[in-house]
Amino acid sequence: MNILHICVTSKWFNIDNKIVDHRP
């Protein structure tokens, strides 16, 4: 796994987490 790939995946995961957290 490339560091860049991990960074991008982490960012997407963080966004997904925020969306899920905002959902009731």
UniProtKB/Swiss-Prot annotation:
Coiled coil: none annotated. L-tryptophan binds at residue 12. One of its GO terms (biological process) is positive regulation of L-tryptophan metabolic process. Keywords: Leader peptide, RNA-binding, rRNA-binding, Tryptophan catabolism. It comes from the Bacteria. Disulfide bonds: none annotated. Changing residue 23 to F: Hypersensitive to L-Trp, stalls 50% of ribosomes at 11 uM L-Trp. More than 20-fold increase in basal expression of tnaCAB operon. It holds the Pfam family Tna_leader. Changing residue 12 to R: Abolishes TnaC-mediated ribosome stalling. GO terms for molecular function: rRNA binding. InterPro entries: Trp_operon_leader_peptide. Changing residue 23 to H: Hypersensitive to L-Trp, stalls 50% of ribosomes at 107 uM L-Trp. More than 20-fold increase in basal expression of tnCAB operon. Suppresses loss of function of D16E mutation. In the presence of L-Trp stalls in the ribosomal exit tunnel near the constriction formed by ribosomal proteins uL4 and uL22, where it binds L-Trp, 23S rRNA, and probably contacts uL4 and uL22. Required for tryptophan-regulated expression of the tna operon. In the presence of high levels of L-Trp release of this nascent peptide by release factor 2 (RF2, prfB) is inhibited. The ribosome stalls with Pro-24 in the P site and a UGA stop codon in the A site. This prevents transcription termination factor Rho binding, and thus allows transcription and translation of downstream TnaA and TnaB. This is Tryptophanase operon leader peptide. It comes from Escherichia coli (strain K12). The lineage of its organism: Bacteria, Pseudomonadati, Pseudomonadota, Gammaproteobacteria, Enterobacterales.
